[in-house]
Amino acid sequence: EMCIRDRGYSGVRPKLATLLLKMINKGILPIIPRQGSVGASGDLAPLSHIGCALIGEGTVYFQDRIMPSMKALKEANLKPIELEAKEGLSLINGTQVSTAIGVKALYKACKLLRTADIISALSVEASLSTRAVFKPAIHRLKKHKGQTVSAKNIYSILKQSMIVQSHENCDKIQDPYCMRCIPHIHGASWDMFANSEKIINNEINSVSDNPLIFRNEEVLSSGHFHAEPVAQALDALSIAISEIGAISERRIHHFMKGADDRLPCFGAIDG
């Protein structure tokens, strides 16, 4: 919300943005239902709950309590605003909620991707697989940044592994796909994450209001309220993260079914 108002194309008074900023600083957070957005015509329904809070209507979260907006404003020594022309529309006609959901998804995805290489390195070690397939020289032949980084991460993690080092001279030709193809899958997911992150960041710093008010007092309508870039970025991110889960499941299956005497079913030596 603040990024959009700061650009100056919404045709709203500075006091509206000021009140919103004061509410954020004092910890007054409008209660927005989990469901209700349409995205294709702006996040009308969820954003309306932010607008309601500014005029003293609806409910908010303040000081660890859910309460009426008017009560929270009074306790924080703030006054609700009386909306003027264009301000009501400006508050609800944008992609802010979709984008906020995207930011949260990116944060969680980043944590998952960062831990995925570490977890998979442990799987490589536990399965008595080789470290050699993660050598940077191999992966530099593929022009995918994510793959190169993932392979380098795993190769570095396993550097001091006595278990992996003891496997260097064994007679096994190749390890299962779920081990030696980790950088290819993790890397592809990292690249997709990076692209989604770029799109979401672009949306954060864009103007998604409609109509737009320009400095020469020209009023122009467009479709900036449409959240298609955000939607496609998050669809792609969902696919990327699901692939991390898929290869993880294959590694679990590998351990459960067993491979030989050194890697028995369920990892249980006796039973």
How would you describe each model-predicted region?
Residues 9-35:
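FAD-binding glycine-rich core of flavoenzymes that anchor FAD
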Residues 228-271:
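C-terminal catalytic subdomain
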Residues 124-246:
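Accessory "access/gating" subregions that flank catalytic or transport cores
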Residues 2-4:
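Short, small-residue-biased leader/transition segments that mark boundaries at the very start
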Residues 46-153, 159:
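Mobile "lid/hinge" segments at catalytic clefts and subdomain interfaces of large enzymes
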Residues 27-31, 74-83, 214-221, 261-268:
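Glycine/charged-rich beta-loop-alpha catalytic/anionic-binding loops adjacent to active sites
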Residues 29-50, 223-231:
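Glycine/serine-rich anion-binding loops at beta->alpha junctions
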